[in-house]
């Protein structure tokens, strides 16, 4: 009972700070986000255009059945079979680690598509007067949160922006610090 009261006390003291964070939101460069989105879509289209030009095949990057003809065309047989369907299992890891340049291009096109659809469109969808006011979940509930006590976010989920990639860095550049302030990065690993 005492532990539960301690948790309640901590959560209650933290709540006003979270409300203020949500109301303030995060500044976003909307024009830069639109331009970056256009760049991602253009690069994806150019990548798939190269695949078609060099192989003669149109590929739907998310459909294994559409990638199968490319595997056949390139005489690639080292893929795993999905037991349920008996078809090729085309995972992210398989595409990224394969030596075939066309499979690497499909992996790249998938990454560009995911960044655009998950992050750029998510950011643009939730901008209000130059800011994003994401939901910050403090504790586990039907609306989100984690069982470990960490925060989670949604609408959009800013925590899922790739941390260690060049494109992830470009997405982070869309967020602006308050005037007269700078961003900082602090990683308190294993501090739960």
Language model features by range: what are they?
Residues 1-170, 176-182, 189-192:
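Conserved "right-hand" nucleotidyltransferase catalytic core of DNA-directed polymerases
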